[in-house]
Curated annotation (Swiss-Prot):
Protein name: ATP synthase subunit beta, chloroplastic
Molecular function as annotated in GO: ATP binding; ATP hydrolysis activity; proton-transporting ATP synthase activity, rotational mechanism
Gene assigned in the entry: atpB
Lineage: Eukaryota, Sar, Stramenopiles, Ochrophyta, PX clade
GO CC list: chloroplast thylakoid membrane; mitochondrion; proton-transporting ATP synthase complex
Catalytic activity, EC: 7.1.2.2
Catalytic activity: ATP + H2O + 4 H(+)(in) = ADP + phosphate + 5 H(+)(out)
Role description: Produces ATP from ADP in the presence of a proton gradient across the membrane. The catalytic sites are hosted primarily by the beta subunits.
Amino acid sequence: MSIEKNNNIGYITQVIGPVIDAVFSSGVLPKIYNALEVEGKDGPIICEVQQLLGDNRVRAISMSATDGLQRGVKVYDTKAPISVPVGKTTLGRIFNVLGQPIDNLGDTPSNETLPIHRSAPAFTDLETRPAIFETGIKVVDLLAPYRRGGKIGLFGGAGVGKTVLIMELINNIAKAHGGVSVFGGVGERTREGNDLYMEMKESGVINEKNLLESKVALVYGQMNEPPGARMRVGLTALTMAEYFRDINKQDVLLFIDNIFRFVQAGSEVSALLGRMPSAVGYQPTLGTEMGALQERITSTNQGSITSIQAVYVPADDLTDPAPATTFAHLDATTVLSRGLAAKGIYPAVDPLDSTSTMLQPLIVGDEHYKTAQLVKETLQRYKELQDIIAILGIDELSEEDRLVVDRARKIERFLSQPFFVAEVFTGSPGKYVDLESTIKGFNMILGGELDDLPEQAFYLVGDINEAISKAKTFNN
């Protein structure tokens, strides 16, 4: 669009950090969420209209730095919300909040764009029957299964394997479901974004030789960017994911890292716009903003968007309004444990702390439910006995408790699994384990059929047959 021919032109009356006020003389004001274009010293600056102030004035939040802007500079109404490229050409590329490539690989040859502000799917278009989203990762599928079109919270500190788990999920959805993934980096460190990109290229998730064969599109709005960009980058990633779901009719994985930063950016913008703060200084519109994002993440008759959201919990306070509002939308939680990572058990998913609303007999079936409950009971009993073992030794336990400990240690090791994306580091070929094989394997351990096998045979294997074969090599 040639904005020079656009007759809806205003000028800046005030600049306060990333917020600009503009007055439009024509009386035809830009609509809320319209993108405004301002000529900055390093090229055009895009702002988004947030408030209509009266007297032909609007207040907008900038998506990039406002350095060098002055009163009286012309402002052009683009007469449309921020729109971003969508489709297969986004795969293997990195974009900013405006959908502009930032990986120095040139423009995307996409003619299709969509506005980032869209309505959630109509109720009649939703797929309401709960279905499990099989990941091929034993610990997830058995103990905290993901819902197709659901929202999963990913909890874990630094260095416990979040990135590797995310990359394995991206790999598995592409291979097993023919789906694609979109990664939204919201307000996290630029270094982490760069590391993730490099690791994705190493593991083959991004195919450098043929970008269209890549399995993921990346959208970054990092913590050095203005709050407007961090607040909207999640919507940019979601819009790209919606296209794959609605037009390409694919299953999509949407990663948001970190959903707390989305709330934090909204809080900054709210204060800059002069709104009265709510509890703990958060924006009064916290629930509305979170709902507008989360309600668009769902299964429809066409396809699904399953979202995995890293959740930072400020000061480990789960009652803080930001994580508390997020929990209301989650169907499952995957908690990564530093203790398991220290033992070398990867993925370091905590089997007792991770939860899922899908783990009900009516949804997963009686066999799956009973197996999962027995696994949790065995691991919980082992956890209770660990203090006694540490003080008195395992010989002081009853015969029954010794058997529980023996099986729990096998279960703990069998919950580990070699990943495809970690082949480069471990040298072990990755394994995708279907749900039926997972349930069968744990039932055999719980039933005592494998009591004579050494526990190290269960470490970093795929299905139970591999563990049995591995045990034979120890005997030889």
